[in-house]
Amino acid sequence: MAKILPTDGIWIPESCSFPEDVMIDMMEGLFRDVPNLTHKEYLALADLQSRWMAKLANRQPESNPLPPKPKKRKKIAPKKQDQPVEEKGSEVDIYDVDDNEMVNNRIYIPRLRSAWRARYFNIMMRAFVIKRGLLNKHINWQILDKIMAAPDAEGQAELQAFVDKVVAGQEM
């Protein structure tokens, strides 16, 4: 005979009704098979059946309801970085101004490294520096690291000095 494995408290509904079915069959058999029952004995047998059924009902395991539905996962919104407040200034089309005219160029450096934060720098330079893309040719990671590690005012001063140095090198 195969060994019955423990159920760990998990009951099949049919297994819960099995003892009740056995009791009902046994009591029906007693009612049929015992001849000449008096009315008092018949009532006592019916009372016995109701008591046994009550005791059996107390000993029945709890039926296993369906497990609760899993809770919905909370979506954690990524933290937004505070963008510096943009200042409204006069904007001009760089190609409409003279090459030697000084213009204010707002340079945005995004957060390219984890230690950085997105920053804006307002740099004064001649229009030809922007038109020819001279800063793009001379800027490198060393300069960016130096500028982004410094506080706002100091970083702006360093970037302005770098731009002035590039412009001075191009004018000669």
From Swiss-Prot:
Residues 69-78 have a biased composition (Basic residues). Disruption phenotype: Viable and ovaries appear normal. However females are sterile. Phenotype likely results from transcriptional defects at piRNA clusters caused by loss of Pol II specifically at rhi-dependent piRNA clusters in the developing ovary, resulting in a severe reduction in steady-state piRNA precursor levels and derepression of transposable mRNA transcription. Residues 58-91 are annotated as: Disordered. Specifically expressed in the ovaries. Residues 79-91 have a biased composition (Basic and acidic residues). GO terms for cellular component: heterochromatin; transcription factor TFIIA complex. GO terms for molecular function: TBP-class protein binding. One of its GO terms (biological process) is transcription by RNA polymerase II. It is found in: Nucleus. It comes from the Eukaryota. The keyword Transcription applies. Keywords: Activator, Nucleus, Transcription, Transcription regulation. Forms a complex with TfIIA-S and Trf2. The name 'Moonshiner' derives from its activity in the transcriptional 'prohibition' of heterochromatin. Part of a rhi-dependent transcription machinery that enables the generation of piRNA precursors from heterochromatin while maintaining the suppression of transposon-encoded promoters and enhancers. Moonshiner/CG12721 recruits transcriptional machinery to heterochromatin to initiate the bidirectional transcription of piRNA clusters. Functions by forming a complex with transcription initiation factors TfIIA-S and Trf2, and interacting with del which is part of the RDC (rhi, del and cuff) complex that binds to repressive H3K9me3 marks in the chromatin. This is Moonshiner. The gene is moon.
